[in-house]
């Protein structure tokens, strides 16, 4: 599961770095937000899976669900 997530993230970052355009502005903003979250200065301050959180930005590549960072593939 982690390998699949890592491959997806790598492919997304490669598509962003090559200048590939997305037709949907919302998708583009989401991809930019993901890139900024993973590569930005706050990336060192985020928690991994099962860490305590208040919002999605508190989690590294995960979602904040009921005060805990969870994998993006697990629904709240």
Curated annotation (Swiss-Prot):
Family statement: Belongs to the conotoxin I3 superfamily.
Domain-related comment: The cysteine framework is XI (C-C-CC-CC-C-C).
UniProt xrefs under PROSITE patterns: I_CONOTOXIN
Name of this chain's protein: Conotoxin Ca11b
Top-rank taxon, per record: Eukaryota
Keywords: Disulfide bond, Secreted, Signal, Toxin
Organism: Conus caracteristicus (Characteristic cone)
One Gene Ontology CC term in the entry: extracellular region
Propeptide: 20-42
Molecular-function annotations in GO: toxin activity
Tissue/organ expression: Expressed by the venom duct.
Positions of disulphide bridges: 46-60, 53-65, 59-69, 64-76
Cell compartment(s), UniProt: Secreted
Signal sequence coordinates: 1-19
